[in-house]
Amino acid sequence: SRTPILSVSNRWKDRKDQAEELLRDVEEMLRTLYLAHIGMLDAKHIVSYPEAWQRLTREADDAVFARLLDAVFEARRRRMNQVTWQAVIEGLLLHMTEEVQPWRR
């Protein structure tokens, strides 16, 4: 369902000045998950993440992480191309939701 995505994007649409900070935070989260995935970071560092993201970290292949990080890069590119911030954030959240969906139970 797109309802949670729209709810989050509505909260962020007026925070355009914090866009880069949000994208950095998402990128850092994904980097942390990837480092745990490849064994360079202990799993205790991701226990505060939702269970679906922890499962993705344990079970997904490397390509999932590449696609997620590419989505952050694409969000930055779209932002630079004058796409509305709300549309950028919706696209990123939609992509992240699709990637984590198989690990929800």
Question: What are these model-derived regions, one by one?
Answer:
Residues 1-105:
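AAA+ P-loop NTPase domains with strong preference for DNA replication initiators
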